[in-house]
Amino acid sequence: IMVRGRAKAFLAGPPLLKAATGEIATDEELGGAEMHCSISGVAEYLAEDDADGIRIARDILARLPWNDRLPMRAVKTWKEPRYPVEQLAGVVPTDFRQPYDMRELLARLIDDSDFLEFKPLYGSSTVCGHGAIEGHPCGFIGNNGPIDPQGATKATQFIQLCCQSGTPIVYLQNTTCLLYTSDAADDMQC
């Protein structure tokens, strides 16, 4: 969790960069929270302030098991999704080549439509996060159209996290094509 405008992570700060290369850059450009959450993928969550960071941390910890030998237990009572499951037919297009927003589908499947998205600003073509179905905690992985390298990296990291915590994974496939490089994206007809 990195706090916008406050958290930074880099190997060499602006003075060293300027001395070594002549390039002028700010702390934020080199290693600010927003950059690490959206471009490098180093950080998973971007908080607006310290209180928001604590809220995010509490939400994450509430979804992870406290014992690595036992899986999360299902809760006995749960809330239905906030959006009717009957609306799924309107969310998923009949043309399988047409992408749709996986979050709309998840909102109709997950208990109380309560989804904690993993790295929401990074690899935006892939949606990963924590939720529950009928009280059973699950990890969810889906994609909004073609899978790009950042999305594949994010999915890999999320799969590792779920495996380490013993969390089952639900895969929701919405791949219209696969992008290997940015040059390949220009050549493909999706």
Q: What would you call each of these model-derived segments?
A:
Residues 168-173, 178:
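Conserved structured catalytic cores and adjacent interaction surfaces
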Residues 51-99:
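Terminal amphipathic helices with adjacent charged low-complexity linkers/tails
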Residues 2-54:
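Mobile "lid/hinge" segments at catalytic clefts and subdomain interfaces of large enzymes
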Residues 7-8, 16, 51-52, 133-138, ...:
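Short, glycine-/Ser/Thr-/acidic-enriched flexible segments
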Residues 78-130:
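Active-site loops and adjacent core secondary-structure elements that bind or stabilize anionic groups
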Residues 117-137, 141-165:
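Long, structured protein-protein interaction/assembly regions in large complexes
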Residues 180-185:
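Conserved small/polar residues in nucleotide/adenosyl-binding loops
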